[in-house]
Amino acid sequence: MRRVPLAHRNLLAEPRRLLAGVVGIGLALMLIGLLGGLWEGIKAQSARYVNATGAALWVLPPGTRTLFAEGTELPTSTLRTVRATPGVDWAAPTWGLFAILNLHDVRAAVVLVGSTPGQPGGAWALARGRAPAADDEVAIDRVLAAKHGLGLGDRLAVADRSYRVVGITRHAGFMTGYVFATHQAVERLLGAPGKTNAILVGTGQPAAVRARLAAQGLTVLDTPEVRRTVIQLNTKVFASPLRLMVAIAFVAGVLIVALTVYAQVAERRREYGIVKAVGASSRRLAALALAQTLVLAALGLVGGGLLLAVGRALLGWARPQFEVVITPGLLVQSVGAALVMALLASIVPARRLAHLDPATAYRGT
């Protein structure tokens, strides 16, 4: 008996059921891929500013383990200490704070970042315009600009001050927009002259320089530590809900495959009875059930890939602040999920076929 052709024939015997099963599995796999892509996107967006600075080390206020913690500051005179440390190639101050803007009677959460013009820590990957050079200028991210209808030359109110938009960046942050200003502008806005809340350090000897800076009483983190902390802060709220939704989608996919194949087995039990009556073993019939679930899962995987591409495009159009990042690892996980779905879904129909009475072939339907 050639079980694979028979598996194909039995699946194709009910095209509408096959199509419904493929679409259902595809939707489940699409949801798994979309949620996984959102998770990767959250991590990528969370770490984007840290990665863009090019810093190897970060000098932070005492007791601080993350960027832009409220109420933390360093004297800008710390810059002289850092720059005078052997092994430091460059050092630049940056000041960030979370703010709520009122844009056309709509509140928008943003991260206001202040940096010294021409030094690292400011706007990067500009799509239009330039980085702010004067204290009354800002650059904003593309999502914030598009959502609130802001363009080059427009005015942006932050607290009691007004700034002119001179640049729009290509990238955006996660859930919050970016507004880039000069460091001095942020100092004036906060009424904190001569202060900063982070110093970026460029060096080719991060371990040695970190030890030297720490020996001077400074709090120093390397970029992997800062990146990890930022990602943890942004993802801890979403981790459990996303995992739950992935689990639900996976269970739904298993049930769809199992029900589709089981219904086909139940309806064609007489044909399977004939196959068993002519000598097919229970193991071979179980393999037939597995072959059918594998074919169905493979078709669902293809459909899920197409649906994922469409869903990703639609989400990017409707909600550009949410990025869906598809990685090779995510693709491997999707294939693995489809395979596990097929294996689990084959259990019930395989048991039904294993216990099928060959006499069914002679009893009619």
Predicted regions located by residue number:
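Hydrophobic secondary-structure segments that place a key small or acidic residue at a functional site
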Residues: 94-97, 103-116, 125-185, 192-194
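Peri-transmembrane interface segments
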Residues: 212-255, 263-269, 274-275, 283, ...
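Hydrophobic, regular-secondary-structure patches
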Residues: 26, 30-109, 208-213
